[in-house]
Protein backbone atom coordinates (compact mmCIF):
# COMPACT_ATOMS: atom_id res chain seq x y z
CA UNK A 1 0.00 0.00 0.00
CA UNK A 2 1.34 3.44 -0.93
CA UNK A 3 2.23 5.69 1.97
CA UNK A 4 0.44 9.01 2.39
CA UNK A 5 2.45 12.20 1.84
CA UNK A 6 1.76 15.58 3.41
CA UNK A 7 3.12 19.12 3.18
CA UNK A 8 4.74 20.28 6.42
CA UNK A 9 6.96 23.21 5.42
CA UNK A 10 7.08 26.02 2.86
CA UNK A 11 9.79 28.46 1.82
CA UNK A 12 9.97 31.08 -0.92
CA UNK A 13 12.07 33.86 -2.38
CA UNK A 14 9.99 35.65 -5.02
CA UNK A 15 9.67 38.97 -6.84
CA UNK A 16 6.80 39.88 -4.50
CA UNK A 17 8.33 38.77 -1.20
CA UNK A 18 11.41 37.23 0.37
CA UNK A 19 9.43 34.75 2.42
CA UNK A 20 6.20 32.80 2.12
CA UNK A 21 4.05 35.09 4.26
CA UNK A 22 5.00 38.24 2.35
CA UNK A 23 4.63 36.50 -1.00
CA UNK A 24 1.20 35.13 -0.13
CA UNK A 25 -0.07 38.49 1.15
CA UNK A 26 1.13 40.12 -2.07
CA UNK A 27 -0.58 37.48 -4.19
CA UNK A 28 -3.87 37.94 -2.37
CA UNK A 29 -3.55 41.72 -2.77
CA UNK A 30 -2.78 41.47 -6.49
CA UNK A 31 0.66 43.06 -6.28
CA UNK A 32 2.87 43.01 -9.38
CA UNK A 33 6.58 42.35 -8.96
CA UNK A 34 7.49 43.85 -12.34
CA UNK A 35 9.69 46.94 -12.65
CA UNK A 36 12.63 48.23 -14.66
CA UNK A 37 15.67 45.96 -14.57
CA UNK A 38 18.29 46.94 -11.99
CA UNK A 39 20.65 43.95 -12.18
CA UNK A 40 22.33 45.16 -15.38
CA UNK A 41 22.12 48.03 -17.84
CA UNK A 42 19.22 47.04 -20.08
CA UNK A 43 18.83 50.43 -21.74
CA UNK A 44 19.78 49.07 -25.17
CA UNK A 45 17.58 45.95 -24.90
CA UNK A 46 14.14 45.61 -26.52
CA UNK A 47 12.82 44.47 -23.11
CA UNK A 48 13.97 46.56 -20.15
CA UNK A 49 11.90 45.24 -17.26
CA UNK A 50 11.48 42.04 -15.28
CA UNK A 51 10.16 40.65 -12.01
CA UNK A 52 13.32 40.82 -9.92
CA UNK A 53 13.80 39.60 -6.37
CA UNK A 54 14.30 42.73 -4.26
CA UNK A 55 16.48 43.35 -1.21
CA UNK A 56 17.84 39.81 -1.04
CA UNK A 57 20.81 39.27 1.29
CA UNK A 58 22.42 35.82 1.00
CA UNK A 59 24.40 36.43 4.19
CA UNK A 60 21.22 36.02 6.22
CA UNK A 61 21.37 32.29 5.53
CA UNK A 62 24.94 31.60 4.28
CA UNK A 63 28.45 32.28 5.49
CA UNK A 64 30.32 34.83 3.39
CA UNK A 65 32.75 32.28 1.92
CA UNK A 66 29.92 29.87 1.12
CA UNK A 67 27.86 32.59 -0.56
CA UNK A 68 30.83 33.75 -2.61
CA UNK A 69 31.17 30.25 -4.05
CA UNK A 70 27.48 29.91 -4.93
CA UNK A 71 25.59 31.31 -7.89
CA UNK A 72 22.59 33.48 -7.13
CA UNK A 73 20.15 30.68 -7.98
CA UNK A 74 21.76 28.44 -5.34
CA UNK A 75 21.68 31.29 -2.82
CA UNK A 76 17.95 31.62 -3.44
CA UNK A 77 17.53 27.86 -2.96
CA UNK A 78 19.38 27.86 0.35
CA UNK A 79 17.38 30.81 1.70
CA UNK A 80 14.05 29.24 0.77
CA UNK A 81 15.14 25.86 2.17
CA UNK A 82 16.15 27.42 5.49
CA UNK A 83 12.70 28.99 5.75
CA UNK A 84 10.93 25.76 4.78
CA UNK A 85 12.85 23.59 7.25
CA UNK A 86 12.23 26.07 10.07
CA UNK A 87 8.56 26.25 9.09
CA UNK A 88 8.37 22.46 9.29
CA UNK A 89 10.06 22.42 12.70
CA UNK A 90 12.83 20.20 11.35
CA UNK A 91 15.84 21.01 13.48
CA UNK A 92 18.93 18.78 13.93
CA UNK A 93 18.03 15.69 15.91
CA UNK A 94 14.38 15.78 14.87
CA UNK A 95 14.88 13.94 11.58
CA UNK A 96 16.82 10.87 10.47
CA UNK A 97 19.45 12.24 8.08
CA UNK A 98 19.60 8.96 6.15
CA UNK A 99 15.83 9.11 5.53
CA UNK A 100 15.83 12.78 4.49
CA UNK A 101 16.44 13.70 0.86
CA UNK A 102 16.72 16.72 -1.41
CA UNK A 103 15.24 17.10 -4.90
CA UNK A 104 15.78 20.67 -6.07
CA UNK A 105 16.09 21.62 -9.73
CA UNK A 106 16.79 24.59 -11.94
CA UNK A 107 15.75 25.15 -15.51
CA UNK A 108 19.01 26.84 -16.49
CA UNK A 109 21.33 26.79 -13.47
CA UNK A 110 24.06 29.31 -12.79
CA UNK A 111 23.63 31.52 -15.83
CA UNK A 112 24.91 34.61 -14.02
CA UNK A 113 28.16 32.80 -13.20
CA UNK A 114 28.44 31.51 -16.76
CA UNK A 115 28.12 34.99 -18.22
CA UNK A 116 30.59 36.48 -15.75
CA UNK A 117 33.20 33.78 -16.30
CA UNK A 118 32.78 33.94 -20.06
CA UNK A 119 33.65 37.64 -19.83
CA UNK A 120 36.70 36.75 -17.73
CA UNK A 121 37.83 34.23 -20.34
CA UNK A 122 37.38 36.64 -23.25
CA UNK A 123 39.06 39.55 -21.48
CA UNK A 124 41.77 37.88 -19.40
CA UNK A 125 42.26 34.37 -20.78
CA UNK A 126 41.70 30.79 -19.70
CA UNK A 127 44.02 30.90 -16.70
CA UNK A 128 41.80 33.45 -14.96
CA UNK A 129 38.61 31.37 -15.06
CA UNK A 130 37.49 30.70 -11.48
CA UNK A 131 38.15 27.17 -10.21
CA UNK A 132 34.67 27.40 -8.69
CA UNK A 133 33.04 28.19 -12.04
CA UNK A 134 31.83 24.67 -12.86
CA UNK A 135 30.25 23.89 -9.46
CA UNK A 136 28.69 27.36 -9.46
CA UNK A 137 27.20 26.85 -12.92
CA UNK A 138 25.82 23.31 -12.96
CA UNK A 139 22.10 22.91 -12.33
CA UNK A 140 22.39 20.22 -9.66
CA UNK A 141 24.51 22.20 -7.24
CA UNK A 142 21.60 23.80 -5.35
CA UNK A 143 20.42 20.32 -4.37
CA UNK A 144 23.95 19.46 -3.29
CA UNK A 145 24.44 22.63 -1.25
CA UNK A 146 21.08 22.21 0.49
CA UNK A 147 21.80 18.57 1.31
CA UNK A 148 25.09 19.62 2.91
CA UNK A 149 23.38 22.42 4.80
CA UNK A 150 20.99 19.99 6.51
CA UNK A 151 23.16 16.85 6.40
CA UNK A 152 20.39 15.21 4.36
CA UNK A 153 21.82 11.88 3.19
CA UNK A 154 18.82 10.36 1.48
CA UNK A 155 17.97 10.63 -2.25
CA UNK A 156 19.62 13.75 -3.66
CA UNK A 157 19.34 14.98 -7.22
CA UNK A 158 18.13 17.77 -9.48
CA UNK A 159 15.34 17.83 -12.02
CA UNK A 160 15.90 19.86 -15.19
CA UNK A 161 12.83 20.28 -17.39
CA UNK A 162 12.64 24.00 -18.16
CA UNK A 163 9.52 25.55 -16.65
CA UNK A 164 8.29 22.19 -15.31
CA UNK A 165 11.45 21.65 -13.28
CA UNK A 166 10.22 22.26 -9.75
CA UNK A 167 6.85 20.63 -10.38
CA UNK A 168 8.75 17.50 -11.44
CA UNK A 169 10.86 17.85 -8.28
CA UNK A 170 7.79 17.93 -6.03
CA UNK A 171 6.17 15.07 -7.94
CA UNK A 172 9.29 12.93 -7.72
CA UNK A 173 9.59 13.73 -4.01
CA UNK A 174 5.98 12.63 -3.56
CA UNK A 175 6.67 9.32 -5.30
CA UNK A 176 9.94 8.75 -3.43
CA UNK A 177 8.17 9.04 -0.08
CA UNK A 178 5.13 7.09 -1.28
CA UNK A 179 7.33 4.16 -2.22
CA UNK A 180 9.26 4.20 1.05
CA UNK A 181 12.66 5.44 -0.11
CA UNK A 182 12.60 8.46 2.22
CA UNK A 183 10.47 9.96 4.99
CA UNK A 184 11.21 13.63 4.29
CA UNK A 185 12.16 15.38 1.05
CA UNK A 186 13.21 19.01 0.64
CA UNK A 187 11.83 19.68 -2.84
CA UNK A 188 11.39 22.52 -5.31
CA UNK A 189 13.40 24.71 -7.62
CA UNK A 190 15.38 27.90 -8.03
CA UNK A 191 16.24 30.26 -10.88
CA UNK A 192 18.23 33.47 -11.39
CA UNK A 193 17.87 34.48 -15.01
CA UNK A 194 17.49 38.25 -14.98
CA UNK A 195 20.74 38.45 -16.93
CA UNK A 196 21.74 39.94 -20.30
CA UNK A 197 21.86 36.58 -22.09
CA UNK A 198 18.53 35.38 -20.72
CA UNK A 199 16.64 38.62 -21.35
CA UNK A 200 18.27 39.00 -24.76
CA UNK A 201 17.63 35.40 -25.77
CA UNK A 202 14.00 35.25 -24.69
CA UNK A 203 13.35 38.69 -26.20
CA UNK A 204 14.82 37.63 -29.53
CA UNK A 205 12.51 34.65 -29.69
CA UNK A 206 9.61 37.08 -29.00
CA UNK A 207 8.61 35.22 -25.85
CA UNK A 208 8.73 38.31 -23.61
CA UNK A 209 6.27 41.16 -23.30
CA UNK A 210 7.82 44.41 -24.50
CA UNK A 211 5.51 46.78 -22.61
CA UNK A 212 8.45 48.84 -21.35
CA UNK A 213 6.18 51.79 -20.57
CA UNK A 214 4.00 49.74 -18.20
CA UNK A 215 5.88 46.84 -16.54
CA UNK A 216 3.30 46.28 -13.80
CA UNK A 217 0.54 45.54 -16.33
CA UNK A 218 2.65 43.57 -18.81
CA UNK A 219 1.92 40.08 -17.50
CA UNK A 220 -1.73 39.55 -18.34
CA UNK A 221 -2.51 35.83 -18.67
CA UNK A 222 -5.63 34.89 -20.62
CA UNK A 223 -6.28 38.54 -21.54
CA UNK A 224 -6.91 39.26 -25.22
CA UNK A 225 -4.07 41.81 -25.33
CA UNK A 226 -1.35 39.58 -23.81
CA UNK A 227 1.94 39.78 -25.70
CA UNK A 228 4.41 37.57 -23.83
CA UNK A 229 5.66 36.65 -20.40
CA UNK A 230 7.67 38.72 -17.93
CA UNK A 231 10.92 37.21 -16.69
CA UNK A 232 10.91 36.31 -13.01
CA UNK A 233 13.38 34.71 -10.61
CA UNK A 234 13.62 33.23 -7.13
CA UNK A 235 13.00 29.91 -5.40
CA UNK A 236 10.19 27.80 -4.02
CA UNK A 237 10.79 24.97 -1.54
CA UNK A 238 8.26 22.48 -0.20
CA UNK A 239 8.89 20.00 2.61
CA UNK A 240 7.08 16.75 1.89
CA UNK A 241 6.81 14.17 4.65
CA UNK A 242 5.32 10.75 5.19
CA UNK A 243 2.08 11.17 7.11
CA UNK A 244 2.78 8.95 10.11
CA UNK A 245 6.26 10.44 10.49
CA UNK A 246 4.73 13.92 10.52
CA UNK A 247 2.01 12.94 12.99
CA UNK A 248 4.46 11.24 15.32
CA UNK A 249 6.40 14.45 15.77
CA UNK A 250 3.31 16.65 16.00
CA UNK A 251 3.98 18.52 12.76
CA UNK A 252 1.56 21.09 11.38
CA UNK A 253 0.11 19.76 8.12
CA UNK A 254 -0.76 22.19 5.32
CA UNK A 255 -2.30 19.63 3.02
CA UNK A 256 -1.91 16.21 1.47
CA UNK A 257 -0.34 15.56 -1.93
CA UNK A 258 -2.52 13.02 -3.68
CA UNK A 259 -1.89 13.24 -7.43
CA UNK A 260 1.03 13.56 -9.83
CA UNK A 261 1.41 12.91 -13.51
CA UNK A 262 4.02 13.92 -16.04
CA UNK A 263 3.63 13.71 -19.81
CA UNK A 264 5.40 14.72 -23.01
CA UNK A 265 4.16 16.49 -26.12
CA UNK A 266 6.84 14.95 -28.37
CA UNK A 267 5.90 17.71 -30.78
CA UNK A 268 7.93 20.96 -30.82
CA UNK A 269 10.90 22.56 -29.08
CA UNK A 270 8.96 25.49 -27.64
CA UNK A 271 5.31 25.07 -28.65
CA UNK A 272 2.54 22.82 -27.35
CA UNK A 273 0.29 20.33 -29.03
CA UNK A 274 -3.01 21.85 -30.17
CA UNK A 275 -5.43 22.20 -27.26
CA UNK A 276 -2.48 21.38 -24.98
CA UNK A 277 -3.27 17.70 -25.42
CA UNK A 278 -0.14 16.72 -23.51
CA UNK A 279 -1.20 18.81 -20.51
CA UNK A 280 -4.66 17.29 -20.75
CA UNK A 281 -3.07 13.87 -20.26
CA UNK A 282 -1.11 15.17 -17.28
CA UNK A 283 -4.23 16.62 -15.64
CA UNK A 284 -6.30 13.50 -16.24
CA UNK A 285 -3.48 11.32 -14.97
CA UNK A 286 -2.98 13.38 -11.82
CA UNK A 287 -6.70 13.25 -11.04
CA UNK A 288 -6.74 9.49 -11.64
CA UNK A 289 -3.69 9.10 -9.41
CA UNK A 290 -5.57 11.03 -6.71
CA UNK A 291 -8.73 8.99 -7.23
CA UNK A 292 -10.64 12.23 -7.68
CA UNK A 293 -13.24 13.59 -10.08
CA UNK A 294 -12.76 17.02 -11.69
CA UNK A 295 -15.71 18.40 -9.70
CA UNK A 296 -13.82 17.72 -6.47
CA UNK A 297 -11.16 20.30 -7.42
CA UNK A 298 -12.05 23.89 -6.53
CA UNK A 299 -8.95 25.77 -7.70
CA UNK A 300 -6.54 25.43 -10.62
CA UNK A 301 -3.26 27.31 -10.59
CA UNK A 302 -2.71 27.54 -14.33
CA UNK A 303 0.65 27.58 -16.07
CA UNK A 304 -0.74 30.79 -17.60
CA UNK A 305 2.36 32.43 -19.06
CA UNK A 306 0.71 35.41 -20.78
CA UNK A 307 1.76 34.14 -24.21
CA UNK A 308 -0.79 33.86 -26.98
CA UNK A 309 -0.67 30.14 -27.70
CA UNK A 310 -0.03 28.78 -24.21
CA UNK A 311 -2.96 30.54 -22.60
CA UNK A 312 -5.58 29.68 -25.21
CA UNK A 313 -4.35 26.09 -25.43
CA UNK A 314 -4.30 25.68 -21.65
CA UNK A 315 -7.77 27.17 -21.26
CA UNK A 316 -9.06 24.69 -23.83
CA UNK A 317 -7.28 21.85 -22.04
CA UNK A 318 -8.82 22.78 -18.68
CA UNK A 319 -12.28 23.03 -20.25
CA UNK A 320 -11.92 19.59 -21.85
CA UNK A 321 -10.59 17.87 -18.72
CA UNK A 322 -13.03 19.48 -16.29
CA UNK A 323 -16.10 19.29 -18.53
CA UNK A 324 -19.19 20.62 -16.76
CA UNK A 325 -17.10 21.33 -13.65
CA UNK A 326 -15.01 23.86 -15.58
CA UNK A 327 -17.70 26.49 -15.01
CA UNK A 328 -17.41 26.35 -11.22
CA UNK A 329 -13.67 25.93 -10.69
CA UNK A 330 -11.62 29.04 -9.90
CA UNK A 331 -8.60 29.39 -12.19
CA UNK A 332 -5.77 31.87 -11.90
CA UNK A 333 -2.22 32.50 -13.01
CA UNK A 334 -0.02 33.86 -10.24
CA UNK A 335 2.57 34.57 -12.95
CA UNK A 336 0.55 37.74 -13.50
CA UNK A 337 2.22 38.90 -10.27
CA UNK A 338 5.51 36.99 -9.95
CA UNK A 339 6.36 36.86 -13.63
CA UNK A 340 7.64 33.57 -14.99
CA UNK A 341 10.13 32.13 -12.51
CA UNK A 342 11.05 29.35 -14.97
CA UNK A 343 12.47 26.42 -12.99
CA UNK A 344 11.14 27.84 -9.71
CA UNK A 345 7.64 28.56 -11.02
CA UNK A 346 6.02 25.19 -10.36
CA UNK A 347 7.06 25.13 -6.70
CA UNK A 348 5.93 28.69 -5.98
CA UNK A 349 2.62 27.95 -7.68
CA UNK A 350 2.23 24.73 -5.70
CA UNK A 351 2.80 26.79 -2.54
CA UNK A 352 0.05 29.19 -3.66
CA UNK A 353 -2.25 26.23 -4.31
CA UNK A 354 -1.56 24.80 -0.86
CA UNK A 355 -2.22 28.12 0.86
CA UNK A 356 -5.41 28.57 -1.15
CA UNK A 357 -6.68 25.43 0.58
CA UNK A 358 -5.52 26.55 4.02
CA UNK A 359 -7.01 30.04 3.80
CA UNK A 360 -10.04 29.42 1.60
CA UNK A 361 -9.06 31.94 -1.05
CA UNK A 362 -8.31 31.85 -4.77
CA UNK A 363 -5.55 34.33 -5.68
CA UNK A 364 -6.28 36.53 -8.69
CA UNK A 365 -5.12 36.82 -12.25
CA UNK A 366 -4.24 40.51 -12.31
CA UNK A 367 -4.27 42.69 -15.43
CA UNK A 368 -7.20 40.71 -16.82
CA UNK A 369 -9.33 43.34 -18.55
CA UNK A 370 -10.35 42.08 -21.99
CA UNK A 371 -11.63 38.50 -22.24
CA UNK A 372 -10.20 36.46 -25.09
CA UNK A 373 -12.82 34.37 -26.92
CA UNK A 374 -10.08 31.81 -27.63
CA UNK A 375 -9.81 31.21 -23.87
CA UNK A 376 -13.51 30.53 -23.47
CA UNK A 377 -15.77 31.69 -20.66
CA UNK A 378 -13.86 30.19 -17.74
CA UNK A 379 -13.47 31.94 -14.39
CA UNK A 380 -9.91 33.29 -14.37
CA UNK A 381 -10.45 35.05 -11.01
CA UNK A 382 -9.94 38.49 -12.56
CA UNK A 383 -7.99 41.13 -10.65
CA UNK A 384 -9.18 40.38 -7.11
CA UNK A 385 -8.71 37.41 -4.82
CA UNK A 386 -11.90 35.54 -4.02
CA UNK A 387 -12.88 33.89 -0.76
CA UNK A 388 -14.21 30.41 -1.39
CA UNK A 389 -13.90 26.88 -0.10
CA UNK A 390 -10.93 25.11 -1.67
CA UNK A 391 -11.06 21.41 -0.87
CA UNK A 392 -8.44 20.52 -3.44
CA UNK A 393 -6.24 22.32 -5.93
CA UNK A 394 -4.53 21.31 -9.15
CA UNK A 395 -1.31 23.03 -10.28
CA UNK A 396 -0.15 22.91 -13.90
CA UNK A 397 3.34 23.36 -15.32
CA UNK A 398 4.65 23.09 -18.86
CA UNK A 399 8.13 23.61 -20.25
CA UNK A 400 10.11 24.00 -23.45
CA UNK A 401 10.81 20.54 -24.82
CA UNK A 402 7.21 19.43 -24.30
CA UNK A 403 7.38 18.69 -20.55
CA UNK A 404 4.00 18.73 -18.76
CA UNK A 405 3.25 18.22 -15.07
CA UNK A 406 0.09 18.34 -13.00
CA UNK A 407 0.03 18.07 -9.21
CA UNK A 408 -3.01 17.66 -6.97
CA UNK A 409 -3.01 18.71 -3.31
CA UNK A 410 -6.04 18.50 -1.05
CA UNK A 411 -7.13 19.40 2.46
CA UNK A 412 -5.70 16.93 4.96
CA UNK A 413 -8.21 14.67 6.67
CA UNK A 414 -7.28 11.81 8.97
Regions from the language model: what does each represent?
Residues 123-130, 168-171, 175, 191-248, ...:
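Glycine-/small-residue-rich "gating" segment that lines the acyl/pantetheine channel
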Residues 77-88, 142, 169, 241-243, ...:
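Short, well-ordered amphipathic alpha-helical segments that serve as non-catalytic structural scaffolds
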Residues 1-2, 36-79, 99, 109-172, ...:
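Conserved catalytic cysteine-centered active-site region
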Residues 181-227, 260-274, 304-311, 328-378:
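Acyl-CoA/ACP chain-elongation machinery
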Residues 84-96, 246-253, 283-299, 321-325:
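Phosphate/pyrophosphate-binding loops at sites that engage ATP/ADP/AMP, CoA/4′-phosphopantetheine
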Residues 4-8, 32-35, 213-290, 299, ...:
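Condensing-enzyme catalytic core mediating Claisen C-C bond formation in acyl metabolism
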